[in-house]
């Protein structure tokens, strides 16, 4: 049902979207059977976020690809950790641009020389973010070890249990082998055993080096919020007081982000997800977070002790009963009115189209 109270609440929320200096985190809840909540869940499941390095895209928001393209990918964690991390990385990557940089002034020759160094630094920073993105999306060393583990184990086993004994016996019994089987068989056994041992040694070396790199990758993931917080503090200015600082980047207004679902069995990732959302909020993003009504109390218990998260959080209850047929008809009509295509669909654009409080009420209530 539409009501003045609902319109007033949503007026407040969407006024915040138009104030880039005061972005908020809005937590909305409803019963899992509620069709409008299920609709958002289906959108979130169908259009998976993918970190895209497309420098020609001025907005550089996360693109949402058809679920068919990503159905074989394995999510790194639960609790929306990977989705939130991907969004934050995309925002940081997109803000590392010349027009966002507070450039130095002075002697033109020194400035040109310095700008060349700044360009190299910018390329290096983007490389670091790309590397972290691979960690988050299981495309780094950890993924390599997981995929190649059976092969590496087999090769090491062949080298240690087959190659070494064959080589020892061949050398010890070389005279008998040459007399009974011939010189060609002796040469074959030597080549086979040396090759097997070499495979085992190389596989062991690859596994050792990969394991060392994976330790660094795991440490980065375990403290990703702290790593990205230091990155932001060092290379971006967050308020007007720092705007005169040179060599720092300014965040663009990055629109609306939508996330849904938290797995409370993954407590460490839940904590990190909330910390990453605080960082995302600092980058001028307006954040909508959906959850089931039964989970809101658990989420509040996580939010309340964190004073920063508490101050930036606003709770909205979307509980409402509506038939499935009515809701689907409403969504189909809404898509036609907004001229949205399911083939070229951006979730951020969807929320951008809903600009008035009355329009939002018609969608959510």
From Swiss-Prot:
Compartmental location: Cell membrane
Keyword line: Cell membrane, Membrane, Transmembrane, Transmembrane helix
TM regions (residue ranges): 105-125, 151-171, 187-207
Membrane topology classification: Multi-pass membrane protein
GO cellular component: plasma membrane
Protein name according to UniProt: Uncharacterized protein MG255
Species annotation: Mycoplasma genitalium (strain ATCC 33530 / DSM 19775 / NCTC 10195 / G37) (Mycoplasmoides genitalium)
């Amino acid at each position: 049902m539409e009501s003045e109270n609902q319109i007033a609440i949503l007026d407040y929320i969407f006024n915040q979207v138009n104030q880039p200096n005061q972005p908020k985190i809005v937590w909305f809840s409803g019963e899992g059977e509620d069709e409008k909540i299920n609709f958002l869940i289906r959108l979130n499941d169908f259009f998976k976020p993918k970190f895209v390095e497309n420098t020609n895209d001025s907005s550089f928001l996360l693109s949402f690809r058809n679920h068919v393209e990503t159905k074989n990918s394995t999510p790194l964690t639960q609790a929306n950790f990977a989705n939130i991390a991907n969004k934050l990385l995309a925002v940081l990557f997109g803000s590392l641009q010349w027009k966002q940089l507070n450039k130095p002034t002075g002697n033109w020759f020194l400035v040109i020389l310095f700008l060349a160094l700044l360009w190299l630094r910018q390329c290096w920073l983007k490389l670091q973010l790309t590397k972290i993105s691979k960690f988050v999306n299981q495309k780094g060393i950890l993924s390599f070890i997981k995929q190649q583990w059976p092969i590496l184990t087999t090769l090491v086993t062949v080298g240690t249990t087959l190659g070494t004994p064959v080589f020892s016996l061949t050398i010890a019994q070389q005279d008998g082998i040459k007399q009974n089987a011939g010189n060609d068989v002796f040469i074959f056994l030597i080549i086979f055993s040396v090759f097997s041992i070499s495979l085992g040694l190389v596989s062991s070396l690859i596994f050792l080096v990969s394991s060392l790199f994976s330790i660094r990758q795991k440490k980065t993931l375990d403290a990703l919020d702290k790593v990205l917080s230091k990155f932001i503090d060092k290379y971006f200015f967050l308020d007007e007081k720092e705007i005169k600082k040179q060599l720092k980047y300014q965040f663009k207004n990055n629109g609306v982000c939508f996330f849904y679902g938290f797995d409370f069995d993954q407590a460490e990732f839940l904590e990190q997800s909330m910390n990453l959302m605080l960082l995302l909020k600092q980058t001028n993003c307006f954040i909508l977070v959906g959850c089931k009504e039964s989970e809101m109390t658990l989420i509040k218990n996580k939010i309340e002790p964190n004073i920063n998260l508490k101050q930036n959080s606003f709770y909205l209850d979307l509980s409402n009963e509506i038939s499935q047929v009515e809701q689907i008809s409403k969504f189909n009509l809404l898509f036609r009115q907004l001229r949205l295509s399911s083939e070229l669909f951006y979730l951020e654009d969807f929320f951008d189209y809903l600009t008035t409080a009355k329009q939002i009420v018609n969608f959510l209530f």
